[in-house]
Amino acid sequence: MPYAIVLSFDDESSLPIYQIFNKYEDKKIGSMFYDPKMKPHITLNTYEKINTESAKERLTLFSIENKSFKIQISSIGYFPVEKSVIFLNPKASNELLVIQQKVSSLFKDFEAGTSPLTWIPHCTLGMYIQKEDITQAIDIIKEEIVITEEKPFYIQTTSISFVKFERDPLKIDWWLDYQFKG
């Protein structure tokens, strides 16, 4: 069963994302975040196998040594693959890139799903979105989140989280948050 290390957000940042999840579910757009344990996040990496006790200890120390930071969302993105992913695209900031590199280093003794060189930071809003639903999916995002140069949308990170999940269909087994204290 796979695991993920993710950045979790504060309630204010998460609210419009939850509203998008709910509207997608109501309108039967895609199928992704209908597990009530799912939280808005940016995945830093995934692992097929990991020593969970060691990971928990490492994340406890990591959360003490690192601090919360803001992430500016620059655009809405879309991966036109079989699973059709629509997402919020964060502006690549030094803080975001450094935290992903630190996590990769911290867990280098486990086989990661993504290399820091190929990592594409994003906050997934939906998967399995049919081609004919893309315009409606984007319109729903625009109703909830306004992204302009004059009024950028920011996400406030609050914790690094350790998640155990199942794929296809997505199901969260557990989600542990480690609040940043640094």
Regions found by a protein language model. Name each.
Residues 51, 73-75, 83:
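Solvent-exposed, flexible loop/coil residues
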Residues 76-81, 155-170:
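Glycine-rich beta-strand-turn "strand-cap" elements at beta-sheet edges
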Residues 87:
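Short hydrophobic beta-strand segments that form the core of ligand-binding sensory/regulatory domains
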